[in-house]
Each structure stands twice: as structure tokens, then as C-alpha cells.
Amino acid sequence: MKLFLLVMAGLAVSGGEWSKPAEIVVDDTVCATYRARVDDGGHLVIALTLADGWHTFAMDNQIRANEKLAGKKALGMDKPTSFVVSGGLTVDGPWMQPALLDFSKPELRIFSWGFEKQASFAAKVKRTGTAARVGIRAQACTETICKDINTSLDLDLALAAGPVEPGLSALTPIRAQ
């Protein structure tokens, strides 16, 4: 019986399951939580959960803002979300992100798009080893404060991939320069 429970516990944290979460804390409150996994479809999926009142920004936020500014100087710029994949994974396709919310304040020449509550990001990947790291840089904000995010997630690729992530078809490719 003990062996059965140990095997089941091991399956619960397998490569098909989510990585250990990276929690971003501001004033004793977890404002953002990131997790990652690789699915059977060969996608690296990164899930973001935000606390009420917090939001973060699109991967292509700067490109979108520059388009709206049309050469004018911005009075403020929110930091885009970015991921750096290293170790036993290589990105083999465009990054995808969900539909965006518009946080822009055109009267102040501030243009920004992003996410509230939850967001998933995905990219097709190739396995090249048994462990990988996903570096995360972003910014999470409320109406009054912002927190720079610089964290990482570790993935054990020696374990089986999980089922294809539902909802990937709703994601769209990020804009490129």
C-alpha cells in the first residue's frame, strides 16, 4: 500500500503536471503565480494567475505601443512579459498569448495591453535534454504600484508530458518587429 501511495504521489508531480509555482509577493500578498509544463502536443505552456486588482502586460506590449505612438515619445511605458527558455528545451515556433485587455491612456500618451486574473502563454518546443529552465521577466501592477518580476521555473523533462492543454486554439501569435 505504501508503495502504491508513493507511485501515485510521483505521478501527481510528473512532467505532465505543472512545475513548482513561482510566487511573486508584494506586502505579504501573492500578486502573481507562474507555473509551466510541456504537453503531449509539444507545447511549453506557462500559466499565470493574478490576484484581484493586479494586471500584467503583453509580450508584444512595446511593439503595440510604438505603433500607436507613431514616432512620438511615450510619457510612460509598461514592461512587456518575456520568457527565456534554456536547458533541455528549445523554442520551435512563435510565442502565443491570450486576447488582450487595453490599459491605454491615450490622453497621456501611454499605450499598454495585458491581462487580469489568468493568462496562458505557449510556444512549440523541442526537447533536447532532461531538464529545462524558463526565465520570466515581467511587470505586475495595480492602479497605484508596480512590481518588477524576475524569476524562473524549473521543469523535469525526463517525466512524461501531460495531455494537450485545452484552450491553446484561443491563443494568438505575438506581434514581431
State what each model feature region is.
Residues G15-Q177:
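Extracellular/lumen-exposed scaffold segments
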Residues K2-A12:
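Sec-dependent N-terminal signal peptides
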